[in-house]
């Protein structure tokens, strides 16, 4: 057993988990439960009253957090200590949304001035493009942006841009390319005019396989359509640490934006990686996005554990994963603009906490990161919600909804909200056999049939959920929401004593992919790998099965 599972608090939580009353009873015996188990911060309201938790549960979870030195670990992250120990890096995505007045030291120097300089450079670039001052090689203004990246360099900008669609500049369109599948970029290029298209290449090394391949294809298309190599600088910019490679490609050094080792890819949308966002919504709105995240940073860093929104959400998720064998967590967004958030949170959580050894290399003997999945309401109610209500697995849920719609048409939003709240109520209370039987009382079914159908209509309830509300989806509230999930992820990793900031599984896939690529291009059939891999590679070389 690890020190964590040997601890008296862990053992107490394990025993306590078997004795928590049904939520129906918890609500019936405490009319003030919502008031006691809801919290407002940074433009968000968290209702966590529909959880399998009592005051004793929360006390034990907060004790577990304290005994795991959570507060000290939070301070260490914000202070720029080397908490990504396997890569010997600080973790300072929070510095990207700091104020100009702050001082944050990384590797012996204050990094805030460089962050502010980059924001100012972004401001000038965005102004140049959106005003029409930036011209393509034929003198036309830019109408289309193509963001080329992968992982955090792709998903963050895409999902945030999608979420903030009401704030877009109507004169610009943005297209996102990530997959190395040639179909992805080919379909995008069919829509574009090379004279008015600007490509943003985002890769720290300027060598990420998928990103470089897509960028080279974009340049070939640009040159084939009439552009010259000398025109590349008017249509390609880069976010990278490798200035030499970017300039060799044809990008003007003045149009290269920096990346830093102390920012992980899945936490990078707040940096120049967010340039596509800034172009679409403007720098004022981009700064509002940063400001909302900064407010959540301040809340996370300073609020006591018992009143700390990311801490509470992280602890409750851990509670279900480690003491109720919950293997997944569903995120349900009741706002069409937020439909991409489950995929973003999936990458954030699963890449961060999909680990199986502690910081000192000991194998864990407890579950770590769950599978994160989800979708938008009300679509899911006609699909996978069935499993949430009557399936055998316990799947905690997060419901996210703005109180006000950007498109208040008729009763649409009233119906959306009623479905959202109704789902949380149904998951909590369920339906008993007697209730199901009573509903069938006036039906034409026989007594035997009623008994049978009633059994099928029983729902156990006691299914946990959080509800997150905001007045309206704005850059600021979106920033706070994303930062909330970042810090929630950190909380769990800190208690599990794992490194939430490396991704060696991703790196292994890259290494083996490059090896396979070389074998695909070889002159002889492959026979050096396992039988399955040899066969698959050789079938691919033949081009038929």
Swiss-Prot record:
**What residue range is the signal peptide?**
none
Question: What is its EC class?
Answer: isomerase
In Gene Ontology terms, what is a biological process of this protein?
Answer: glycolytic process
Query: Per its UniProt entry, which superkingdom is the organism in?
Result: Bacteria
PROSITE patterns (alphabetical):
P_GLUCOSE_ISOMERASE_1, P_GLUCOSE_ISOMERASE_2, P_GLUCOSE_ISOMERASE_3
Output the SUPFAM superfamilies linked to this UniProt entry: SIS domain (SSF53697)
Q: Where in the cell is it found?
A: Cytoplasm
Q: What family does the Swiss-Prot or TrEMBL record give for this protein?
A: Belongs to the GPI family.
Q: What is this protein called?
A: Glucose-6-phosphate isomerase
In the record, what lineage is assigned to the organism producing the protein?
Bacteria, Pseudomonadati, Pseudomonadota, Gammaproteobacteria, Alteromonadales
Gene this protein is translated from: pgi
């Amino acid at each position: 057993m690890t020190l964590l599972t040997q601890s008296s608090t862990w053992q107490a939580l394990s025993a306590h988990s078997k004795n928590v009353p049904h939520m129906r009873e918890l609500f019936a015996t405490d009319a003030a439960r919502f008031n006691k188990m809801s919290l407002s911060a940074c433009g968000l309201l968290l209702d966590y009253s529909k959880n399998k938790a009592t005051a004793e549960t929360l006390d034990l979870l907060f004790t577990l957090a304290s005994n795991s030195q959570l507060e000290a670990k939070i301070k260490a992250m914000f202070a720029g200590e080397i908490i990504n120990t396997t890569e010997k890096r600080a973790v300072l995505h929070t510095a990207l949304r700091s104020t100009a007045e702050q001082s944050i030291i990384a590797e012996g120097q204050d990094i805030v001035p460089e962050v502010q300089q980059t924001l100012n450079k972004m401001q000038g670039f965005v102004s140049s493009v959106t005003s029409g001052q930036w011209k393509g090689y034929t003198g036309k203004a830019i109408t289309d942006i193509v963001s080329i990246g992968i992982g955090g360099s792709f998903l963050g900008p895409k999902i945030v841009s999608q979420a903030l669609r009401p704030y877009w500049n109507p004169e610009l369109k943005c297209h996102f390319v990530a997959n190395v599948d040639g179909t992805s970029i080919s379909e995008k290029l069919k829509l574009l005019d090379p004279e008015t298209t600007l490509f943003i290449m985002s890769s720290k090394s300027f060598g990420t396989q998928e990103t470089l391949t897509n960028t080279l294809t974009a340049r070939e298309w640009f040159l084939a359509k009439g552009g010259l190599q000398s025109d590349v600088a008017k249509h390609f910019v880069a976010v990278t640490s490798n200035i030499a490679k970017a300039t060799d490609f044809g990008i003007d050094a003045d149009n290269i934006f920096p990346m830093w080792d102390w920012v992980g890819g899945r936490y990078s949308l707040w940096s120049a990686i967010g340039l596509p966002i800034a172009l679409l919504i403007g720098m004022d709105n981009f700064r509002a996005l940063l400001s909302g995240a900064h407010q959540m940073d301040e809340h996370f860093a300073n609020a006591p554990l018992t009143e700390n929104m990311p801490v509470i959400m992280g602890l409750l998720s851990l509670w279900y994963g480690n003491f109720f064998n919950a293997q997944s967590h569903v995120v349900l967004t009741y706002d069409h603009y937020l439909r991409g958030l489950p995929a973003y949170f999936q990458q954030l959580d699963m890449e961060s906490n999909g680990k199986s050894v502690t910081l000192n290399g000991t194998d864990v003997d407890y579950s770590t990161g769950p599978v994160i999945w989800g979708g938008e309401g009300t679509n899911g109610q006609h699909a996978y919600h069935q499993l949430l209500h009557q399936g055998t697995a316990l799947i905690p849920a997060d419901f996210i909804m703005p109180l006000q719609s950007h498109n208040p048409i008729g009763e649409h939003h009233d119906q959306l909200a009623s479905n959202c709240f109704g789902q949380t109520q149904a998951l909590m209370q369920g339906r008993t056999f007697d209730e199901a039987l009573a509903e069938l009382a006036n039906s034409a079914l026989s007594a035997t049939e009623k008994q049978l159908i009633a059994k099928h209509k029983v729902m156990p309830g006691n299914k946990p959920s959080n509800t997150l509300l905001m007045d309206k989806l704005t850059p600021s509230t979106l920033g706070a929401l994303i930062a909330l999930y970042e810090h929630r992820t950190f909380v769990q990793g800190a208690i599990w004593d794992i490194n939430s900031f490396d991704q060696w599984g991703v790196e292994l896939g890259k290494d083996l992919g490059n090896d396979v690529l070389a074998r695909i291009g070889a002159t002889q059939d492959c026979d050096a790998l396992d039988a399955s891999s040899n066969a698959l590679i050789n079938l691919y070389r033949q081009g038929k099965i």
